[in-house]
């Protein structure tokens, strides 16, 4: 819920770690309100802050859970309240791009600005959010997110979501 997300964001703020929201909460931050229920929070953290973020999670009673998709740069954390953080580690390249899991993305990808109630957050900007929803089998939450992003930010709805 929104209180849990705000608390997790506050942990990062207190630790002076810059985070970028992705996924459903990233969409809702761009919209400025919670548009649906979420089962986790997707967070990107720069490589230089990754270990500190993990230590902060552990200090707040989160533990790592192994999933079939976890890697060195993509870990999942849960606590006793069943709050789940989907944590992604990226780095900036010398060419000013974002490198994540071997793929490069334009620096503007992280230029989104949003809010979770009164907390201002950086997030994936709207067009990139829509593009990242392509090329896989999507569910009703994806349809909800893409349609809201396209309506709100005047982005053409991709064919597979029509």
Residue ranges and their predicted role:
Residues 1-162:
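Compositionally biased terminal segments of proteins
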């Amino acid at each position: 819920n929104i209180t849990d997300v705000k608390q997790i964001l506050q942990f990062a703020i207190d630790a002076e770690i810059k985070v970028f929201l992705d996924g459903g909460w990233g969409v809702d931050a761009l919209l400025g309100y919670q548009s649906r229920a979420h089962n986790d929070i997707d967070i990107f953290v720069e490589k230089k802050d990754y270990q500190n973020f993990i230590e902060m999670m552990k200090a707040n009673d989160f533990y790592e859970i192994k999933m079939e998709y976890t890697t060195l740069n993509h870990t999942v954390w849960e606590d006793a309240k069943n709050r789940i953080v989907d944590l992604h580690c990226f780095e900036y390249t010398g060419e000013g791009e974002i490198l994540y899991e071997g793929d490069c993305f334009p620096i503007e990808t992280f230029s989104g600005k949003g809010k979770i109630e009164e907390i201002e957050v950086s997030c994936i900007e709207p067009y990139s959010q829509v593009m990242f929803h392509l090329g896989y089998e999507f569910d009703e939450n994806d349809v909800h997110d893409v349609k809201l992003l396209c309506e709100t930010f005047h982005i053409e709805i991709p064919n597979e979501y029509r």
